[in-house]
UniProtKB/Swiss-Prot annotation:
The lineage of its organism: Bacteria, Pseudomonadati, Campylobacterota, Epsilonproteobacteria, Campylobacterales. Keywords: Bacterial flagellum, Periplasm, Signal. HAMAP family: FlgI (MF_00416). Assembles around the rod to form the L-ring and probably protects the motor/basal body from shearing forces during rotation. The gene is flgI. It is found in: Periplasm; Bacterial flagellum basal body. The keyword Signal applies. Belongs to the FlgI family. The keyword Signal applies. NCBIfam families: PRK05303.1 (NF003676). GO terms for cellular component: bacterial-type flagellum basal body, distal rod, P ring; outer membrane-bounded periplasmic space. GO terms for biological process: bacterial-type flagellum-dependent cell motility. This is Flagellar P-ring protein. The basal body constitutes a major portion of the flagellar organelle and consists of four rings (L,P,S, and M) mounted on a central rod. Pfam families: FlgI.
């Protein structure tokens, strides 16, 4: 298995983005909904008799329809207990449709071909905000037996829920509106304040900290008109240098300009020596790894003399050496701990 490296030309570059892309409007957000339900119509791929909660749920459902049956008498494998989730968008109105996600709770083999029965979706306050029902769609299933496909124990119901209860909003009555930066940064917050005060020709924006910008709506604008104009403004910003590592998939995402300082590091049987001031000629039996790297196969030492050694260079060379993904990830983490990488390292 080789590690997958994705390099993005982000670090040390100045970009422009709209305020809408950089911020959230405080109070204007999605709300999570959850419910417990049953999927029926499965072709023998549902929960087995060991999932007692499924049998009890079937019994309870049938009793609600005046059909009395004991859970111990139910032998159906065409039903599965599932958890149903959805997001209730800001300003959603009664009758609006929502997409829902469905995931098996028991030991069902597959939800393919199933139908979700009427399921109440509740918020964190315990109130019912939507009701879901409909046929399940499982995307990406392989048509060939034995071929890899997606997880067949999770599915979606497109437009499968109907909003029954609205969340009260006071957006149009708010005198002050708050923007929250998705990535806290003093410079970006200051840029937003400066641009908005210039556009509106008055002090309507005040950066309170590295994330929060307070807005005061001018009387001549409605709330909707004001926010529409605010959110469309372009702001110059510099993305934070970051290296993201996904340990599960062996993926490293890094800006192409993220440099690594001179260092000597040994991991297992691999030694990496970064010394841009020491020009090393290709010796006997040594291998040119490109990217400014030379491999001594005897000592298994990778000597890097490139004036600008980057995370991308090192990852590529280690890949060529056949290093395991977990070894490459460990080396990156140790480089960060040693202070050779100044960018933020995020492991997911």
């Amino acid at each position: 298995m080789r590690i997958f490296l994705l390099c993005l030309a982000l670090s040390l570059s100045v970009f422009a983005a709209t305020i809408k892309e950089l911020t959230n409007v405080v109070g204007v957000r999605d709300n999570q909904l959850i419910g417990y339900g049953l999927v029926v119509g499965l072709n023998g791929s549902g929960d087995g008799t060991s999932s007692e909660f499924t049998l009890q749920s079937i019994s309870n459902m049938l009793q609600g329809m005046n059909v009395k049956v004991s859970p111990g008498d139910i032998k159906s494998k065409n039903t599965a207990a599932v958890m149903v989730t959805a997001k209730l968008p800001a300003f959603a109105r009664s009758g609006d449709k929502l997409d829902v996600s469905v995931a098996s709770l028991g030991d069902a083999k597959s939800l393919q071909g199933g139908t979700l029965l009427m399921t109440a979706l509740k918020g964190v306050d315990g109130e019912i905000y939507a009701v879901a029902q409909g046929s399940l769609a499982i995307g990406g299933l392989s048509p060939r037996p034995g071929a890899a496909g997606t997880h067949s124990t999770s599915a979606n119901v497109i437009n499968g829920a109907v909003v029954e209860r609205e969340i009260p909003q006071n957006f149009s009555q708010s005198e002050d509106l708050i923007l929250s930066l998705k990535e806290a940064d003093f410079k970006t917050a200051n840029n937003i304040e400066r641009v908005l005060n210039t556009i509106f020709d008055t002090d309507i924006a005040k950066a309170l900290d590295s994330r929060t910008i307070k807005l005061t709506k001018p009387e001549e604008f409605s709330h909707v008109e004001f926010m529409a104009r605010v959110l469309e403004q372009d702001i110059a910003y510099t993305p934070e240098s970051k290296v993201i590592i996904d340990e599960r998939t062996g993926t490293i995402v890094a800006g192409v300009n993220i440099e690594v300082e001179p260092i000597l590091i040994t991991h297992k049987d691999i030694t990496i020596k970064i010394d841009p001031n020491n020009t090393v000629a290709l010796g006997q039996n040594e291998i040119d790894m490109k990217d400014g790297g030379i491999l001594d196969p005897v000592s298994n030492t990778l000597k890097i003399t490139n004036n600008k050694t980057t995370v991308a260079n090192i990852a590529r060379m280690l890949n060529k050496l056949g290093a395991a993904p977990n070894d490459i990830i460990a080396i990156m983490q140790n480089l960060k701990r040693a202070g050779a990488i100044s960018a933020e390292l995020e492991v997911i």
